[in-house]
Amino acid sequence: MNKKSLPLMALRDIVVFPGVIAPVFVGRQKSLHALSNTTLSEEDNSKYILVTLQKKFDQENPNRNELYDVGILAKVIQIVKLPNTTAKILVEAIARVKISNIKGDEAFEANYEIIPDEEIFDANNMRSLVDNAVQLFAKYAGSDKKINAEIIETINKEISETSNFINIINILASHLITSLEEKQRLLEETSPFKRISTIINILTSNIVNSETEQALQQRVKKQIEKTQRDYYLHEQMKAIQKELDEDKSDLAEFDKKIKAAKLSKEAREKAEAELKKLRTMNQMSAESGVTRNYLETLLSLPWGKYDNSKIDINQAEKILNRDHFGLEKVKERIIEYLAVLQRSSKIRGPILCLIGPPGVGKTSLIKSIAEGMGRKYTKFALGGVRDEAEIRGHRKTYLGSMPGKILTQLKKVKTSNPVMLLDEIDKMGSDFRGDPASALLEVLDPEQNSHFVDHYLEVEYDLSNVIFIATANSYNLPRALIDRMEIIDISGYMEEEKIQIAKNYLVPKQLKMHKIKKDEITISDDAILDLIRYYTKESGVRSLEREIGALTRKALKQILADKKVKHISVDSNNLEEFLGARKYNFGLAEKNDQIGSTTGLAYTEVGGELLTIEALSFPGKGEIKTTGKLGDVMKESAMAAYSCFRSRAADFGLKYEDYKDFDVHIHVPAGAIPKDGPSAGCALFTTIVSLMTKIPVRRTVAMTGEVTLRGNVLPIGGLKEKLLAASRGGIKTVLIPEENVKDLKDIPPNIKSSLEIIPVSNIDQVLEHALTKKT
């Protein structure tokens, strides 16, 4: 075909199909110019124009690259100019065309070439597809309320007036409710079969969506009608009850409870006011539910209810000794506390706080205290608590509000004088929701807790009869909180104590738990000692109990699997057969006296340990280097020890030239374990002196103590645990600070008898006992 040129107009929101007459609103300048450039055709004295869809709807002035290259050759049937410089035109789409060579600035003009439809070879198949599409369109138009009835009638008329399949397809396509991009793809498609198939798919999808939307609307309508009906029936029932003057049983029950409860004057007035308010409320309202919950909570608290406890310190002492081995000083302090309570029902002394590592029996001690006092026991776990409302409660204006855990626990035990454990008090945090530690100050202060006000209750509640006892693993507590409590340290158990606990408590408990008779298994003391040393590493006995449990299960399995086995004996020789290879090792003394290697003593959260400190020297700048994952305090101890050595080098027969060009590298194995603290000063100094003087350190000597720059030895902590580690590791002599001699009275006699304990006050005394010869 010959190419021709015509004005081109970009359409924003409509795709016109061949054979369809469509109205077009023209408002953009380029479109108006293109319309004015149309001229009368010589053939039929009509105006023709090219129209095509722009690719982006919101593009105000699209360029030639932003127009689709397949459009329509249209005849302008009518032009109506509107007052606001716009126009409305009526166009008849003549044919689909390929647009090319677009040009022009004020108005587009382009060449075009008509694109014919492909020939229809199977008329019968096409007829059935077209009929199917027409039926689907009628069904969709009938189900979708968005399509006007007049439009449906017009479309049906257009379809009935033509027998041309292509025209029917174009009429259906022009009235489809789908995206402009989808319509443009239909226009560009030259195959009638593909076009009608796409139309059928779109209509089918639209029908499914329409039916789904209608079903959803119907369900929503029914739900609204049901809600309105229920509300009407409730209101009608209330009106009938009011006419009959019937009492509301639940409100009458509240009234009885208020009269029967031993409420304080303030609480009674508050309860009566809330009940009066509840009587006038709509029972279906949200506020009614809030008020009802408040009254239920207020009346469920144990107002004026106390256990008739009678403290007998002799009986309490028996209970403590029955449930706990060792811990003599701790039990003595608890008995003193109970003795004061026996004489005075209202104690104004400090709150007890038991501080010690996990598994040493802090929680079970408090249970025994409650039993010894004849009071109920309750627990408030503070670990991870960050919200102040956990202590003081939420104000009842908030959705889902409730009282704090203090009052919740009292409600649970139904008494106002229980023993309440504040567990893991050192694990509390604080964030934007408040500081629970500060909220606890009021609870733990004997001068204030008789007037404790929970935010939810909004009335005072007397907590002065509650015995609060806290537990913690460390001293990481706010200063103000520590001031309100008396700290009782619970150190870890000695090996001998663990053996007795295992024999008298843990083994019988596990045998009973696993239904094993005493004559079916025997665990020797040596096996228990190996369990403690090689399968656990703790201050308490929790892991020990787990290992004993594993041991008894293995034994039970053997007994049940082999009927010939009637008794199993476990000792140190066959322990690994039950529990596998050893998990831990403890430090042992060196096999030989070493130069530049000293045995120190460390105190960790799992007990005492031998700490090997070694050093090397090599050419350098006279500097000191430390490795072994040492903390800041221990690094500073090493620097202080090195400075002390350099100031005394002449006393050891060394000249400045002997060490000024040498670096000292101090290492503390194992390198992966963090270490910190000042008590390694003596060992660090001895290591440096031994290295520089080439005098070995006695392998049977261990030491602990902090060293000052002037060579004085300062006291340390954890002496009992350190001496136990020394005795266990084959150490014969231990050097301790002279100021720690007072602590030796707390050391078990068997430990003191196995060691030569030498007090030292300065570094000269340390070197005298530690080095194999005098410097």
Curated annotation (Swiss-Prot):
Pfam families: AAA, Lon_C, Lon_lid, LON_substr_bdg. Residues 6-207 form the Lon N-terminal domain. ATP binds at residues 356-363. The active site is at residues 679, 722. Its EC number is 3.4.21.53. The keyword Acyltransferase does not apply. It is found in: Cytoplasm. Homohexamer. Organized in a ring with a central cavity. ATP-dependent serine protease that mediates the selective degradation of mutant and abnormal proteins as well as certain short-lived regulatory proteins. Required for cellular homeostasis and for survival from DNA damage and developmental changes induced by stress. Degrades polypeptides processively to yield small peptide fragments that are 5 to 10 amino acids long. Binds to DNA in a double-stranded, site-specific manner. Belongs to the peptidase S16 family. This is Lon protease.
